């Protein structure tokens, strides 16, 4: 198995966790092999795209046989660094932040929120699902070197200022749930998740592109 890092298109990289989750389900059900058409039906990605995605990693399957589920699962587990725990911090413990803490990636044993911050004096010091809520004023003193990813669920008005503090503290990745489009240096990656925008887009497609 090739363990060298492979540079792949970002669109492909975003689909890898989707493949991995389905492969986990297949493995749990005892299935030993799967075809690209079966994968396509399950993850709603056309089979040609799946084959192209997989081709970036070399020969992962055999023509006429398909893919060995256990082999693929092991391969993508290593590719997605699922053999190691990724510690994450949460900034903002409002309704969404609290929901994320309660969920805390329970279906993914390799990602875990280990610290949370807020400015609300009534929340500071409380514990939600085993995670103590710290004072955001103490952010820089509390961040440890093994936590380089942050989830941002603060009000949009303070999103950029908070992101600046995270970057200065050494954070390398931010999952931004705020409506603000935050600016960060080139060495920091941000993924924006705006639930309102996603819902508006869904409604638009339902009205203009009915199935």
UniProtKB/Swiss-Prot annotation:
<keyword id="KW-0520">NAD</keyword>
<keyword id="KW-0804">Transcription</keyword>
<comment type="subunit">
    <text>Homodimer.</text>
</comment>
<comment type="function">
    <text>Modulates transcription in response to changes in cellular NADH/NAD(+) redox state.</text>
</comment>
<dbReference type="GO" id="GO:0045892">
    <property type="term" value="P:negative regulation of DNA-templated transcription"/>
</dbReference>
<dbReference type="GO" id="GO:0003700">
    <property type="term" value="F:DNA-binding transcription factor activity"/>
</dbReference>
<dbReference type="Pfam" id="PF06971">
    <property type="entry name" value="Put_DNA-bind_N"/>
</dbReference>
<dbReference type="Pfam" id="PF02629">
    <property type="entry name" value="CoA_binding"/>
</dbReference>
<dbReference type="InterPro" id="IPR036291">
    <property type="entry name" value="NAD(P)-bd_dom_sf"/>
</dbReference>
<keyword id="KW-0805">Transcription regulation</keyword>
<dbReference type="GO" id="GO:0003677">
    <property type="term" value="F:DNA binding"/>
</dbReference>
<dbReference type="GO" id="GO:0051775">
    <property type="term" value="P:response to redox state"/>
</dbReference>
<comment type="similarity">
    <text>Belongs to the transcriptional regulatory Rex family.</text>
</comment>
<dbReference type="InterPro" id="IPR036388">
    <property type="entry name" value="WH-like_DNA-bd_sf"/>
</dbReference>
<dbReference type="InterPro" id="IPR003781">
    <property type="entry name" value="CoA-bd"/>
</dbReference>
<keyword id="KW-0238">DNA-binding</keyword>
<dbReference type="InterPro" id="IPR036390">
    <property type="entry name" value="WH_DNA-bd_sf"/>
</dbReference>
<dbReference type="GO" id="GO:0005737">
    <property type="term" value="C:cytoplasm"/>
</dbReference>
<keyword id="KW-0963">Cytoplasm</keyword>
<feature type="binding site">
    <location>
        <begin position="92"/>
        <end position="97"/>
    </location>
    <ligand>
        <name>NAD(+)</name>
    </ligand>
</feature>
<protein>
    <recommendedName>
        <fullName>Redox-sensing transcriptional repressor Rex</fullName>
    </recommendedName>
</protein>
<dbReference type="InterPro" id="IPR009718">
    <property type="entry name" value="Rex_DNA-bd_C_dom"/>
</dbReference>
<feature type="DNA-binding region" description="H-T-H motif">
    <location>
        <begin position="18"/>
        <end position="57"/>
    </location>
</feature>
<keyword id="KW-0678">Repressor</keyword>
<dbReference type="InterPro" id="IPR022876">
    <property type="entry name" value="Tscrpt_rep_Rex"/>
</dbReference>
